[in-house]
C-alpha cells in the first residue's frame, strides 16, 4: 500500500485505524516550529445510501471520503491547508502549505488553537462493528423489507415514495500543539 500504511491498520471496510490517524497527526505536530500553534484534523468515512421503490432498488450509492486539514497560527496570522489524502508525506507538505498561507494572512490577535479544558471526555461507545459485516446485498434486503413492511401494514396503503436505508462508518483524529489529542471511530444507520 502507498503512503506507508499497512493492510493491518485498515478495518473491514478499508478505513484506517483512528489511532493510526492520531499518530500521523502527532507527527505533524512534532514538526511545529517555535512560536507556531498547529492543529491537525484527519478523517475518513464510508457512507451507503439505498432507496427501494416498487419492490426494487431505485438508487444505491456508496462513497468513501478522506480529508485532512492543517492549521498554523504564527504571530496572529492563521493559515489553513486541506487535502483528500492522509499519508505522512502529504501531511508534511500540507504543513508547509499552511505555513505559507499563514504568512500571507492578516493578523488576528485572538487567533488560537483550542486548549484542553480539563473536562474528561465521556466514555461513549459510538461504534458498532456489525455495520462493517453487512454486505451491500444485506443492506438492499433491509431497504426492500422496510418497503414491504410499510405496504403490508395497512390495506389502505397504495404506495410509498420510497424506503431508504443509510449507514456510515467514520474514523477521525485531531491533535494540536496545545495538548488536544483525540481519536475515535463511530457508526450509524437509519431506515
Q: What do the PLM-derived regions correspond to, one by one?
A:
Residues 1-191:
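Active-site bordering "gate/hinge" segments
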